[in-house]
């Protein structure tokens, strides 16, 4: 007892000492809290909402969550005005029948608008901490049997309703998976695709549908489930159906979406758990129940017997792997030398996998097509796809090899393919430089190059780009610091065979590079494309806005996937317009270059002021538009950047 009493006295003395010490600290109330814990003044500005779930439980069938919201600087967000709360549970794999995949069951949602109505109990503790208790009781759902042993999920959509003081709030999503009684993490999950994979093409998943409401793929997967949406709108069916017919190289491989990621621990389900619904969403001509296109399967119980994980993965990724293996086997190196008679000599060497030149004759019978396109003036080509009104000349398109045979005018010299172009419209400045874009298409089977036959499968190989001058001086080259092809590969893959079919197909790699970025890494540019995508357009002479400056905007705008400049552009090189003339914007009509480029995305009338008053010519004649090409005054006021192309100088 004496020792216990002594201890109590000691504690009291220690507490008194601490109190006295704090009193002598100049009246400071201490720090606002450790990093990561809300405290102090609320966030004055909010670009990002970060959610942390502190407690999630279901009591007698009623879900409740406690959560913390901070901004990008870890400051507490106070006064959120409108949220939607949704509840779901996850049926495990096999629970509804042998071979069946796991499946979300969506109980419902409640929208809480502080200024109007709130079905449940919403508490804002005014320090970044919030809580919500649902009004709905999951046990009362007539369609779904609540099971407290299953993994549970609560999702939050925070609306972009401004805070009471007017602070703007971004639309945001968050979710938590938990066990009903303790709130602990469940022992199984269904996180098959990471939002990061979606954003590789979409940049922001929120822009795809539903007015920007849902930016997390897990929200999509939880809502688009049987019983909540109609047949065919289930997430695994809908997404495959939407993407399967897109001509994007990256979608040839399931792993473009189903990739290993901490946010998608179940990414391997695509090959591990085959079902009729999932497989049939891509293989849409198969009717498993009727036995059409496949042996009859009335349920999923027997799928895995044939379609084991390794074999399924090999079938679906093998094509891409084989293509990469073929592409790696050969390369090209080319030179272009201008001659006094205005011709140019093009010499193409075939390289082995190690970059060593080989005798082209040794692989000639395996070449389906070696195609070359030559033009003059890399920054503003003066040879049209068809004859240009300016130079009177069209690009020089020449196959050096076709179906294993040398073409007319082509010779083999010391194992290299040599061709002399017709006379080119050389001039001074940029037009002292000619350039040739080269594509190579090889016959192949699996991972092997094979002799070409009438019905040979083919693989497009690494493209090459060569420059040459008549003067002998260093060539001029088009800027490549605005769009790096790596951004194209995000959607189209690194084996994208550009224009294969009409052309040999061009696979863009470091082989076409002639510049490096700030880190010394080779830039894979897209400048070779202007050999065909000339200022005078392509085959339609402007009617399809085929000039390179416009074509990519037009085609990607039509598809609706590209909605932000930053999805493709790492920079804008506005100085490039100083060396451009007019661009063909309709059949036989031309527009000054800045305006032509802008109107490939924006309708002229939407720009908001008379373009002609700013020096522009819209759909004028060739001479008129080219004379005015450097008279546009757009950049006197406008200073567009990839992150804000509406920016103006103030």
UniProtKB/Swiss-Prot annotation:
- Secretion signal: which residues? 1-21
Keywords assigned by UniProt, alphabetized: Signal
- Pfam families in the record, alphabetically? Mtrc-MtrF_II-IV_dom (PF22113), MtrC-MtrF_N (PF22111)
The answer to keyword Signal applying to this record is: yes
Identify the InterPro entries for this entry: Decahaem_cyt-c_OmcA/MtrC, MtrC-MtrF_dom_I, Mtrc-MtrF_dom_II/IV, Multihaem_cyt_sf
Q: Where on the tree of life does the source sit, at the highest rank?
A: Bacteria
Protein's name in the database: Multiheme cytochrome MtrC
């Amino acid at each position: 007892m004496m020792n216990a009493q002594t201890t109590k006295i000691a504690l009291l003395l220690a507490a008194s000492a601490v109190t006295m010490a704090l009193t002598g600290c100049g009246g400071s109330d201490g720090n606002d809290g450790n990093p990561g814990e809300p405290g102090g003044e609320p966030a004055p500005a909010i670009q990002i909402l970060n959610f942390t779930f502190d407690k999630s439980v279901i009591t007698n069938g009623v879900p409740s969550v406690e959560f913390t919201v901070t901004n990008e600087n870890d400051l507490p967000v106070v006064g959120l005005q409108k949220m939607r709360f949704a509840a779901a549970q996850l049926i495990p794999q096999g629970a509804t029948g042998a071979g069946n995949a796991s499946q979300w069951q969506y109980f419902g949602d409640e929208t809480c608008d502080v200024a109007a109505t709130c079905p449940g109990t919403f508490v804002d503790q005014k320090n970044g901490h919030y809580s919500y208790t649902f009004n709905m009781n999951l046990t009362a759902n007539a369609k779904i049997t609540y099971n407290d042993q299953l993994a549970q999920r609560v999702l939050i959509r925070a609306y972009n309703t401004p805070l009471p003081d007017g602070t703007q709030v971004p639309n945001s999503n968050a979710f938590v998976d938990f066990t009903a009684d303790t709130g602990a993490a469940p022992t199984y999950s269904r996180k098959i695709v990471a939002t990061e994979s979606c954003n590789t093409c979409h940049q922001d998943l929120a822009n795809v549908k539903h007015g920007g409401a849902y930016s997390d793929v897990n929200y999509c997967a939880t809502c688009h489930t049987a019983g909540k949406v109609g047949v065919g709108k289930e997430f695994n069916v809908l997404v495959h159906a939407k993407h399967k017919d897109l001509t994007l190289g990256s979608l040839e491989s399931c792993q473009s979406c189903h990739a290993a990621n901490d946010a998608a621990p179940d990414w391997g389900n695509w090959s591990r758990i085959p079902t009729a619904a999932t497989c049939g969403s891509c293989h849409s001509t198969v009717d498993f129940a009727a036995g059409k296109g496949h042996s009859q399967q009335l349920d999923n119980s027997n799928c895995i017997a044939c379609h084991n994980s390794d074999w399924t993965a090999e079938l679906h990724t093998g094509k891409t792997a084989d293509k990469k293996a073929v592409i790696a086997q050969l390369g090209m190196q080319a030179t272009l030398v201008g001659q006094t008679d205005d011709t140019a000599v093009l010499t193409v060497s075939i390289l082995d996998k190690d970059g060593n030149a080989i005798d082209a004759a040794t692989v000639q019978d395996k070449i389906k097509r070696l195609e070359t396109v030559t033009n003059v003036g890399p920054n503003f080509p003066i040879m049209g796809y068809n004859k240009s009104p300016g130079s009177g000349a069209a690009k020089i398109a020449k196959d050096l090899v076709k179906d294993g045979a040398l073409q007319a005018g082509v010779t083999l010299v010391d194992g290299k393919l040599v061709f002399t172009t017709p006379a080119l419209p050389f001039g001074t400045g940029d037009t002292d430089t000619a350039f040739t874009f080269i594509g190579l298409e090889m016959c192949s089977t699996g991972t092997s190059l094979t002799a070409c036959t009438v019905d040979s499968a083919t693989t497009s190989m690494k493209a090459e780009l060569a420059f040459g001058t008549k003067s002998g001086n260093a060539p001029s080259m088009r800027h490549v610091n605005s769009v790096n092809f790596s951004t194209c590969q995000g959607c189209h893959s690194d084996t994208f065979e550009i224009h294969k079919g009409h052309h040999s197909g061009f696979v863009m790699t470091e082989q076409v590079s002639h510049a490096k970025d700030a880190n010394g890494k080779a830039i894979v540019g897209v400048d070779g494309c202007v050999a065909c995508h000339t200022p005078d357009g392509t085959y339609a002479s402007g009617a399809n806005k085929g000039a390179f400056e416009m074509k990519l905007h037009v085609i990607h705008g039509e598809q609706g996937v590209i909605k932000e400049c930053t999805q493709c552009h790492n920079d804008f090189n506005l100085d490039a317009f100083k060396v451009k003339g007019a661009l063909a914007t309709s059949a036989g009509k031309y527009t000054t270059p800045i305006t032509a480029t802008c109107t490939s995305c924006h309708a002229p009338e939407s720009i908001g002021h008379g373009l002609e008053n700013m020096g522009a010519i819209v759909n004028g004649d060739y001479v008129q538009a080219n004379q005015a090409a450097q008279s546009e005054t757009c950049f006197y006021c406008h200073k567009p950047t990839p992150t804000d192309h509406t920016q103006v100088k103030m």
